[in-house]
Swiss-Prot record:
Gene Ontology biological process terms, A to Z: translation
Species whose genome carries this gene: Cyanidioschyzon merolae (strain NIES-3377 / 10D)
Record key words, sorted: Chloroplast, Plastid, Ribonucleoprotein, Ribosomal protein, RNA-binding, rRNA-binding
Keyword check for Ribosomal protein: yes
GO MF, one annotated term: structural constituent of ribosome
Known partners and oligomeric status: Part of the 50S ribosomal subunit.
InterPro entries on file: Ribosomal_uL3, Ribosomal_uL3_bac/org-type, Transl_B-barrel_sf
Gene3D superfamilies: Translation factors
Name of the molecule in the record: Large ribosomal subunit protein uL3c
Function as written in the Swiss-Prot or TrEMBL entry: One of the primary rRNA binding proteins, it binds directly near the 3'-end of the 23S rRNA, where it nucleates assembly of the 50S subunit.
Family according to the record: Belongs to the universal ribosomal protein uL3 family.
GO CC entries: chloroplast; cytosolic large ribosomal subunit
């Protein structure tokens, strides 16, 4: 087992697996090919210790304590970093939904639909009156929804096959998105 517990992967899609009792388990299949160590970050030169790793056309840094275990040119894959039954965290960018109203973005209730009301999907009152005479910063309103980074913790590894891995549950992002598994 390697000390490095973080790799990059791409999302393949969701499926289901069955346990020994016949229960269906939702799984997300991710693909992670070979990672190559291409450089080191040392405390003397950079102020911290890390590996620079290439996966396909992405280059990322992974913090480690001992660089000696990872010479430049070493190849890493799923079987060297993870094992079945292990719990992992997955970081990825969520699906962007564009400009969304306050109901979809913040789950606010709608206005009345009858008796002459015209504010069906309006935000209603957004602040106080003459005092303070302004809208407080951070007030939840319509705006961009999604497209930000999210971490899902505690996903269990159910299967590892060659360069693919089945994680129990859902991971953020679309099919083909880059994931960081830790």
């Amino acid at each position: 087992m390697s000390l490095l517990m973080s790799l990059l992967a791409t999302k393949i899609g969701m499926s289901q697996l069955f346990d020994e009792k016949g229960n269906a388990l939702p799984v997300t299949w991710v693909k992670s090919g070979v990672h190559e160590v291409i450089d080191h970050r040392t405390p003397e030169k950079h102020g911290y210790t890390a590996l620079v790793v290439r996966y396909q056309h992405w280059i990322r840094e992974f913090r480690v304590k001992h660089l000696s275990a990872y010479p430049i040119g070493r190849r890493l894959d799923l079987s060297t970093c993870f094992q079945i039954g292990q719990k992992v965290s997955v970081k990825a960018k969520t699906i962007g939904k564009g400009f969304a109203g306050y109901q979809k973005r913040h789950h606010f209730a709608r206005g009345p639909m009858s008796h002459g009301s015209k504010n069906h999907r309006q935000p209603g009152s957004i602040g106080a009156g003459t005092f303070p005479g302004r809208v407080f910063p951070g007030t939840r309103m319509a705006g961009r929804l999604g497209g930000n980074f999210c971490t899902i913790k505690g996903l269990e590894i159910l299967q590892i096959q060659n360069d693919q891995m089945a994680l129990k549950g859902a991971v953020p992002g679309k099919v083909g998105n880059l994931l960081r598994i830790e």
